Amino acid sequence: MNTYLKKSCLIFISLFGMSLSLSFAQLSEPLPFMTHAKPLSAEIVDLGMLDTVPSTAALVRLPNRKIVYMVKEQGKWEPFYVKAIETGYWDTRYEKDTDYDSVFADMREMGANTAYVMLHWEDIEPADNRFDYSFADSVVAAAGRQGLKVGWVLFLHAQKERVPSLKPETAWTFHLDDRDSSNYTMQWVKRDGKLYSNIKDILDYGVRPLHVYGHKEIFYRVRRMLYQLARHYRFDETVIGVQLGNEEGFSFLDESDFNPVTAELYKEWMRKTNKTDYAQFKKEAMDWWWQQFTSAYHEGDPYKIISFNLDAAQAEAGDPERVAMTGTSASTYADGNLDVIGTMFYKGWGYKAILGLDHRYNNSYNYQLPILIPSEIGIGRFNSPVWFRHFIAHTLERAAQGFGVYCYGEVRKELPELGDVRNELIRMLKNISLNEDIIWEGLPGPGAVSCQVDEPGVQVSHLNKNGQETLALIYFPEAKEITDSSRVSNLRTLKLNCMTQKERQYKVDIYKNGECIKSNSLSLKAGISRSITVEGIRMDDIVFVSIR
């Protein structure tokens, strides 16, 4: 056998062995509680190495150092900016014989490219170690037929509102250690001095049952389930990632956890850390459990993203009581090894949450994990139009890699009374799509041209693509607080002052409500400002200005 042939055979054998190791890799053994180990995050791939990635989705570092998301479409890598609408228990999953093809076609018609779909642990593991993906696969197939991606919103807990089933008290994961009429795999809570240790009693009283994540019967099963989920969809072109839990943590409604299993974990934590503060125990335990869970997922799939969210963003906002109760905060996303900050933006706590997240991540949103992709920006009943627009603007100006809108039940086509809300979403998604190349690749700050508006109270934020092309976002921050509708609706003419340090001809396109309302060719000289007038602007508008 000649040397060339020998080398070829060795390469083939090596690759074949690597392929086998990938195909038959096993999940690592669970670590003892609070054992230090470096967690596994999603791989970040340099753009030049993208074609070597054995996946259908990946986090990619661009030459400008920004981390972006890309997906493989028909064998070709493409930029992907997440524009998601969430659906699940409180709209489509409560309906009999939901036609997901129709649901996803409707989302696509509105301009979404992703469906965030609620999926329960019991949907894919209906009995212990018996995995069944028939429901999940049918959802994925329908989304694929309609040209949508799927991000799973993976529920672990139960809720009175038929989560995960019509009889949530029968959820098998809460009955792995039943003794003395109590469920030991569930957090025990107190309300008004009364202890609840049984899932039926908790549900009857309206409390949300949550697992003891460190219980030996729960801990390894969550890891196993996440690993299996990751392996099942690793090479699927429709599934782009998963949100690990929906509003999980220690109970945020009541005092917890009075389960003796958790008491033993607390004692173990004290022995291993020489600390005693119970709120600190909750924080460090949550961080460690989520590190182990995310690592298990990435053992199964090193590339697709895993996110998380916290109830109403109250913990991200730094509410002391919520932080102490739940063991979560703005830092949870980094300390818990999440790839994505999947926060929520609603009127109640949204702005304080932004401040809390900025304090923790302001210099790293774009350059290291976790990146920002809010999971729920409320629309319809959950945010007024101006609040919705402003939360989108705050997401864009931080150069996030997408967002999710909550929820489909507020915008679906067959409910004509929701027409105004639906059109609100359509217009916003259209504005974004028309400028998506700058938004996806762009970083905060102006490019070759910077813009200013002289009128008091106007915010101008910039994104730039490689220091050249610019997208300016113009809005009135105070509009969300104004109750005088006539003041808000009064039409204004804004004078947009443009300046560059690079003399040349620029094309300026101005967008509002999903349409280009003005297009100009602007000749700029270095250091000399020129203005463009923008007519017909309301205080609750958001204006997109692209300069190329």
Kindly give the residue locations of the regions a language model identified.
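Bacterial N-terminal signal peptides
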Residues: 11-21
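N-terminal carbohydrate-binding accessory modules
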Residues: 27-112
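Aromatic- and carboxylate-lined catalytic core of secreted/periplasmic carbohydrate-active enzymes
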Residues: 35-37, 46, 393-494, 502-506, ...
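Short, acidic/polar
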Residues: 93-109, 316-333, 384-392
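Aromatic-lined substrate-binding rim segments of carbohydrate-active enzymes
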Residues: 99-184, 189, 286-300
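Polysaccharide-binding and catalytic clefts of secreted carbohydrate-active enzymes
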Residues: 178-348
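Catalytic-core region of carbohydrate-active enzymes that cleave or remodel glycosidic bonds
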Residues: 291-305, 327-410
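C-terminal beta-strand-rich structural cap/linker in extracellular carbohydrate-active enzymes
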Residues: 518, 523-548
